[in-house]
Amino acid sequence: MKKSVRSPGSATVINAIATGFGAAFGIGLDIKCCANTQNSSITCSNDVGAPTTLMEICAKKTFEKYGISSDDFGMNFKTESELPMASGLSSSSALSNAVVSISSKIIAEEFNLMPLDDLEIINLAIDASLEAKVTITGSFDDATASYFGGVVVTDNKNRKFIIKEKMEEYPVLVYMPNFGSKSGSSDVGRMKVLSPLVETAFGLARSGDYFKALNLNGLIYANTLGFDSNIAIDALEVGAIASGLSGTGSSFVAICEDEAIDDIKETWSKYEGRVIETKVDNIGCQFIG
């Protein structure tokens, strides 16, 4: 049996590290995962030569959930990614969602078992990400924005939704500097110092004012983590609706109307790195074969 799944990344509205409450929205950059059955063992590979630890943990946890031994039944996983790694665009959440969802579907069909429901998949993927130490909070906001698409506002500590809804499919520009930033190794203490300010930004998100929330959150975290907040301000100056640091960096995102795309690209061209053009994703994780 062979199946393929598409799993998009997400961008930050509110980074949950400071307060435990977060918000994020799906973007049109994704990871594609293809899996096929084999006689035994779990084998994983990707197109970027990165460690496959997270993939292996996701598959192992799904096998354990169903009581399946990889000595008697196996799967081979391969991924191709449009998502830059260690950039604040939820590549780990997208990857874990993809592997858990595809392995669950194959096992359920192969053994005539019930497939995991959406939240079971998400929670298993989060548990795997925590075990792999690629997340600090569990990233329920990132994981659910990736899985469902649209925008989510969440209580990450308790893995609960506050808001889950579709978002207008604006163009999204991503500025990628020539370096990454792993969220699992971020300075948590430094970020928590600013929790009162982040709570103010979260209040905006909770009331549905996502763009102001993104702007404020981005400025707070960029300055706290040593990124150049002028990147976001420059985008706002030339017409972005909202712009800010995504996750713990290193990427910045700008949400805009079509007519502002070229101006934002131009103003960001003075910074070393590259600009990726995508849009808001409202589809989420879906099987494509």
UniProtKB/Swiss-Prot annotation:
Subcellular location: Cytoplasm
Metabolic or biological pathway: Metabolic intermediate biosynthesis; chorismate biosynthesis; chorismate from D-erythrose 4-phosphate and phosphoenolpyruvate: step 5/7
Broad class of the protein's primary localization: cytoplasm
Catalyses which reaction(s): shikimate + ATP = 3-phosphoshikimate + ADP + H(+)
Domain of life from the UniProt record: Archaea
Annotated residues for binding of ATP: 84-94
EC category name: transferase
Keyword hit for Endoplasmic reticulum: no
Record GO terms (molecular function): ATP binding; shikimate kinase activity
The protein's Enzyme Commission number: 2.7.1.71
InterPro entries (UniProt xref): GHMP_kinase_C_dom, GHMP_kinase_C_sf, GHMP_kinase_N_dom, GHMP_knse_ATP-bd_CS, Ribosomal_Su5_D2-typ_SF, Ribsml_uS5_D2-typ_fold_subgr, SK_arc
GO biological process, one term: amino acid biosynthetic process
Pfam families: GHMP_kinases_C, GHMP_kinases_N
A cellular-component GO term for this protein: cytoplasm
This protein's UniProt keywords: Amino-acid biosynthesis, Aromatic amino acid biosynthesis, ATP-binding, Cytoplasm, Kinase, Nucleotide-binding, Transferase
Family: Belongs to the GHMP kinase family. Archaeal shikimate kinase subfamily.
Protein name: Shikimate kinase
Organism: Methanobrevibacter smithii (strain ATCC 35061 / DSM 861 / OCM 144 / PS)
Gene: aroK
